[in-house]
C-alpha cells in the first residue's frame, strides 16, 4: 500500500493532474478485523504528514458485511453532500455486536502504516452503537486520540476515568427511546463526581429523539471543534469556544457546497440507495 501511495503521488507530481479526493474500500486486510473505507481529501498527496485522521463508528442498523451500507449517514455522506472535511476519514463496518476498541486500533494502525498522516490529530466520533464504541475507544486509548464526540450512546466500560483524560463531547436527546439518555448521564455523573470532568462537554437536547443528533456530522463546527485539539497540547485543554445546539442542526446543510463532485470511488457503487433514517 505504501508503494501505491508513493506511485499515486509521483503520478500527480509528474503529470500535474488536478487534485481530487478518493474513496477506497479496504477489505480483508486485517485478519479477523474490520473492513473499512478510507477517504483521502483533495490535496492529500501534497500535505500527507499534516493531514489529521477521523474515525467514524456507525450505529447498529448498519452492522453486517455489506461495506456500502456504512456510507448512508455520517462523515462520508456529508462529504458527498458537499461538506469539506480535510482529513483522512476512516469508516469501519462492525459485522455485529459491540464495537471492539482493539479492532478499531488495528484499523488505525493499518492506516498509519499505509497512509502518511498526522498521528497527533486522530479523532473518533460515533452515534448510537457507535456512540458506545466512541466512549469505549477513547476511554481505553486516551493517549492515542486527540478528541472524541459521542452522540446518543453510552459505554460498556466500568472505569470511565480514561474519558477524563482527553477533550470529549457527549450529546444526547431527552426524548431518545432507542438509547435512553440515562446511558450518557451515568458517564457524565461518574466523571463529575470524581472531579474528572475538566475536559468534558455535555449537552442534553430537550425533546430530541434518537435521530436528531445525526445532523451533527454534517456541520462545519463539528470538525472545527475536533481539529482544534492535538496530542501535542501538554495539558490537553478542551475547546469551549465552539457550541452546537439543537437549533443549529436545522442549518446543518446551509453552507455545504453542493456543486462539488463526489469523491472518485476506487471500489464500490457511486450511489447508495436511500432507505430512510436508521441509526
What do these predicted ranges mean?
Residues 175-180, 211:
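Acidic catalytic loop of the alpha/beta-hydrolase fold
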Residues 51-53, 57-105:
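Active-site machinery of serine-nucleophile hydrolases
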Residues 111-114, 120-164:
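Primarily recognizes the serine-hydrolase "nucleophile elbow" in alpha/beta-hydrolase
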Residues 42-49, 98-128:
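Gly/Ser-rich "nucleophile elbow"/oxyanion-hole loop immediately N-terminal to the catalytic nucleophile
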Residues 164, 169-172, 176:
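Short beta-strand/loop motif that positions the catalytic acidic residue
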Residues 16-53, 87, 132, 137-140, ...:
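A domain-start/cap signature at the N-terminus of enzymes
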Residues 68-70, 180-190:
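Short alpha-helix in the alpha/beta-hydrolase fold that links the catalytic acid
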Residues 191-211:
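Catalytic histidine neighborhood in serine/cysteine hydrolases
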Amino acid at each position: 500500500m505504501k508503494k501505491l501511495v508513493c506511485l499515486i503521488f509521483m503520478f500527480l507530481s509528474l503529470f500535474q493532474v488536478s487534485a481530487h479526493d478518493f474513496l477506497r474500500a479496504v477489505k480483508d486486510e486485517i485478519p479477523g478485523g474490520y473492513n473499512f473505507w478510507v477517504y483521502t481529501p483533495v490535496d492529500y498527496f501534497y500535505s500527507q504528514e499534516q493531514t489529521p485522521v477521523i474515525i467514524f463508528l456507525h450505529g447498529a442498523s448498519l452492522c453486517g458485511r455489506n461495506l456500502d451500507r456504512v456510507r448512508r449517514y455520517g462523515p462520508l455522506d456529508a462529504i458527498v453532500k458537499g461538506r469539506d472535511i480535510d482529513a483522512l476519514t476512516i469508516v469501519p463496518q462492525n459485522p455485529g455486536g459491540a464495537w471492539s476498541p482493539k479492532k478499531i486500533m488495528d484499523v488505525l494502525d493499518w492506516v498509519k502504516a499505509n497512509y502518511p498522516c498526522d498521528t497527533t490529530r486522530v479523532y473518533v466520533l460515533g452515534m448510537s452503537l457507535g456512540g458506545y464504541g466512541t466512549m469505549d475507544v477513547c476511554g481505553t486509548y486516551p493517549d492515542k486520540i486527540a478528541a472524541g464526540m459521542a452522540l446518543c450512546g453510552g459505554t460498556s466500560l466500568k472505569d470511565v476515568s480514561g474519558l477524563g483524560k482527553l477533550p470529549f463531547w457527549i450529546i444526547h436527546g431527552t426524548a431518545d427511546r432507542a438509547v435512553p439518555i440515562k446511558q450518557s448521564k451515568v458517564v457524565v455523573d461518574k466523571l463529575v463526581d470524581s472531579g474528572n470532568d475538566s475536559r468534558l462537554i455535555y449537552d442534553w437536547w430537550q425533546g430530541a429523539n434518537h435521530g436528531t443528533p445525526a445532523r451533527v456530522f454534517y456541520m462545519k463546527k463539528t470538525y472545527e471543534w475536533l481539529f482544534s485539539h492535538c496530542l501535542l497540547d501538554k495539558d490537553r485543554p478542551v475547546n469551549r469556544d465552539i457550541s452546537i445546539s439543537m437549533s443549529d442542526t436545522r442549518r446543518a446543510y446551509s453552507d455545504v457546497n453542493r456543486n462539488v463532485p463526489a469523491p472518485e470511488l476506487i471500489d464500490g457503487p457511486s450511489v447508495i440507495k436511500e432507505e430512510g433514517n436508521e441509526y
